[in-house]
A protein has these predicted regions:
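N-terminal glycine-rich anion-binding loops that anchor highly charged ligand groups
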Residues: 31-38, 42, 66-78
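Active-site-adjacent loop and "lid" segments of alpha/beta metabolic enzymes
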Residues: 2-7, 13-17, 24-25, 31, ...
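Conserved Motif II region of HX4D acyltransferases
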Residues: 207
């Protein structure tokens, strides 16, 4: 049994900024309401075809313009599919997918906040130098020992997600004695590590679908409020995932209704950022949530 952080173990703003603020590109961004992160997959094999742009800058432009006009405040670009059992992608291939898109968006959509989804420090560094603003790491530094020092050097916001193993073997690592306690303990230790490196702008992601069974995913979602003990922004990424399609017996293309339902539940449980494929529908959900909780 792992100890659960209690109220006395909350991370106060002496170490990290207040929950609804982030330092981004020299600006203090204040978010009093939940935000939307629009997904742009620079891959040929991400599990939802509608999010794929590949290396086509025309398709990148189409997706980004749609996400921004529909209410996304962050764009999340990824060049390495992390779906269960996904194929390994070489470092240079990931760079070749990500960097041109970052430069294009930074040049043509000025003012947009660009997040890059990578667990590789080299990709992270090149992306920030190309115009990205934050790093979204599915391994929280566990797959590349240089990631955390690199983020510290770059002084950019860092999204730390919980996962065991890697995308190729993570679904073989789903045995927990106390999944909620173990994940909270993992983040408590991870935040201490980040603090020692001077990283202050941190967002946490429980990692739905990463080294978790269907039942474990729903258990974590039901208990999402427990992550409030960490006093940091909470990102939830459940959009069109198999935890929805398996229950509804549909494929990813048909999982929008289920995504919308669970996104509303996540907001009610304390989610601060929703990472989504369908920004328009997520924004409608957010408007209803903000009407319920003005």
């Amino acid at each position: 049994m792992f100890p659960l952080p209690g109220k006395s173990s909350k991370t106060e703003d002496k170490s990290f900024p207040q929950k609804n603020t982030l330092q981004i590109d020299g600006r203090l961004i204040c978010w009093d309401k939940p935000q939307l992160m629009g997904i742009v997959n620079l891959t040929p094999d991400s599990f939802f075809e509608g999010s794929r742009a590949g290396k086509s800058l025309d398709r990148v432009t189409e997706l980004v313009a749609s996400h921004i006009s529909n209410g996304a405040s962050i764009l999340d670009l990824g060049g390495y599919s992390s779906r269960p059992g996904s194929a390994e992608v070489g470092l240079q291939e990931e760079i070749d997918r990500v960097i041109p898109a970052v430069k294009w968006i930074a040049s043509n959509f000025s003012g947009s906040l660009i997040s890059v989804d990578t667990f590789r420090s080299k990709v992270a560094e090149e992306a920030i130098l190309a115009g990205a603003h934050m790093i979204n790491d599915i391994s929280a530094g566990d797959l590349d020992e240089e990631m955390i020092p690199t983020v510290a050097k770059l002084q950019v916001p860092y999204i730390a997600m919980h996962m065991r193993g890697n995308p190729q073997n993570m679904q073989e690592k789903t045995k927990y004695s106390d999944i909620l306690g173990e994940i909270l303990y993992y983040f408590a230790e991870k935040l201490e590590q980040l603090r020692k490196f001077g990283i202050k702008d941190v967002i946490i992601d429980p990692g739905f679908g990463f080294a978790k069974t269907l039942e474990q995913n729903y258990f974590l979602l039901r208990n999402l409020q427990r992550f409030e003990t960490l006093s940091l922004p909470l990102l939830v990424g459940i959009s069109r995932k198999s935890m929805i399609s398996k229950v509804l017996k549909v494929n990813a293309n048909e999982a929008l209704n289920g995504t919308t339902a669970l996104n509303m539940f996540a907001l009610c449980q304390g989610a601060n950022i929703l990472r989504v494929h369908d920004v328009k529908e997520a924004n409608e959900t957010l408007k209803l949530y903000n009407t319920l909780y003005p």
